[in-house]
Amino acid sequence: MRMFDVQGVEIVASRQKVFEFLRVPGNLTRWAHAFVSAGNGRARLETPAGAIDIALEVDADAEAGTVDWRLTFPDGGVGLAQSRVTETTRDTCIYSFVLHAPPVALEQVEGALDAQSALLRSELATLKSLMEP
């Protein structure tokens, strides 16, 4: 059973520009579809299944180019996502994203991860369009 998915996108923008955008929690609302608000250690997610307020920790390291998120749900469940922005020799950067299976019952993991993986592809395309000239 798959417990994670890794996706990436090449973006015609500097590593610094993309990293600086990603490290700001409030920008999640511009590219991560479920986020309707984010900031000050909190976020609100809305999906077809409903809305929920969560704790949101962001760990960003400019030198490494990493931006990692820890989402803590009211029931104590924890969701993780790790990402990295790397530069290329083509005046572009590559943004890679590790999506972990959500904190749901094991029998729901595969379907939930498949759905989130499809959504992530769309979100990465949105991010790319926001960052490119």
Predicted regions and their residues:
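Hydrophobic ligand-binding cavity/cleft-lining segments
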Residues: 1-38
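Generic structural detector for well-ordered beta-strands
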Residues: 8-12, 57, 84
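An N-terminal domain-start capping segment
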Residues: 1-2, 49-51, 125
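Glycine-rich portal/gate segments that line the openings of hydrophobic small-molecule binding cavities
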Residues: 27-80, 88, 94, 130-133
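Short beta-strand-to-loop capping motifs
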Residues: 11-13, 47, 71, 101
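Conserved short-loop catalytic and cofactor-binding motifs
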Residues: 6, 42, 108-111
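Beta-strand/loop substructures that line and gate deep hydrophobic ligand-binding cavities in soluble
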Residues: 73-122, 126-133
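Generic recognition of short, well-ordered alpha-helical interface segments
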Residues: 13, 23-26, 53, 118-122
